[in-house]
């Protein structure tokens, strides 16, 4: 998957969210990137961030186990023009996928965003498969005319992402509920208040790293 550190960090900038507070306490731990939630999106963010050169990354999960709602989903991933479709004798195209998405959205969706989703989904799919995780079947999802829903085992995907994160030095903490984001409109997120002692406060390393972000 071809992602530069600059493009990755630029993409993260749209996910910053915080509540305004006048004062932030001294943090117990400081990280360059704090990811809240350990589902597929959260763990993938942490892994790609670490691969992109961000050194101190932490994932906070409020449940005692990893996975979030990803662990209980059906595991269907709709992607067009894959080698798995070819092996199954399925003829598909990105244009057909695009048209199906427009129909499903009653043509109220933005065409450029649909194209972006299809392209980005393919990149992420290929990145996952290259890591050794394979779909077990290809079927039809609701709203799609052609079998392009690649069935994955959610437990296997989460386990794979966890192993990748650990190898890259990502710190993972479970049973940590994020209660409050502390900061202001001028400086952004300055600290994160959690529910787990003794580490009650985390903070993005914004004093030394101007590109730090917090992802929720």
Each language-model region and where it sits:
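N-terminal Rossmann-like FAD-binding beta1-loop-alpha1 element of flavoenzymes
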Residues: 33-58
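Short glycine-rich loop/turn motifs that provide flexible caps or phosphate-binding loops at active sites
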Residues: 13, 36-41, 66-67, 74
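Conserved beta-strand-loop-beta-strand element in the redox core of flavoprotein oxidoreductases
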Residues: 182-210
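Short hydrophobic core segments
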Residues: 36, 206-216
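N-terminal secretory signal peptides and thylakoid transit peptides that target proteins
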Residues: 1-15
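Bacterial Sec-dependent signal peptides at the C-terminal "C-region" and cleavage site
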Residues: 18-25
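A short, charged/proline- and glycine-enriched loop
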Residues: 27-32
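Conserved N-terminal/central alpha/beta ligand/cofactor-binding core
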Residues: 56, 62-181, 186-188, 195
């Amino acid at each position: 998957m071809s992602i530069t550190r600059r493009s990755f960090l630029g993409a993260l900038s749209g996910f910053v969210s915080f509540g305004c507070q006048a004062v932030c306490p001294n943090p117990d731990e400081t990280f360059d990137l704090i990811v809240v939630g350990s589902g597929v999106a959260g763990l993938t963010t942490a892994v790609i961030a670490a691969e992109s050169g961000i050194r101190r990354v932490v994932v906070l999960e409020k449940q005692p186990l990893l996975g979030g709602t990803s662990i209980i989903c059906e595991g269907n991933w709709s992607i067009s023009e894959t080698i798995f479709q070819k092996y199954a004798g399925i003829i598909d195209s990105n244009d057909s996928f695009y048209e199906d998405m427009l129909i499903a959205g009653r043509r109220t969706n933005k065409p450029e965003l649909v194209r972006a989703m299809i392209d980005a989904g393919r990149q992420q799919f290929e990145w996952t498969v290259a890591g050794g995780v394979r779909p077990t079947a290809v079927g039809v999802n609701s709203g799609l005319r052609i079998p392009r829903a690649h069935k994955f085992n959610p437990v296997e995907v989460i386990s794979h992402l966890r192993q990748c994160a650990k190898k890259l030095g990502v710190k993972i903490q479970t049973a940590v509920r994020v209660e409050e984001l502390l900061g202001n409109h001028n400086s952004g997120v300055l600290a994160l208040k959690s529910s787990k002692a003794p580490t009650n406060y985390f903070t993005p390393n914004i004093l030394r790293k101007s590109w730090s972000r917090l992802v929720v």
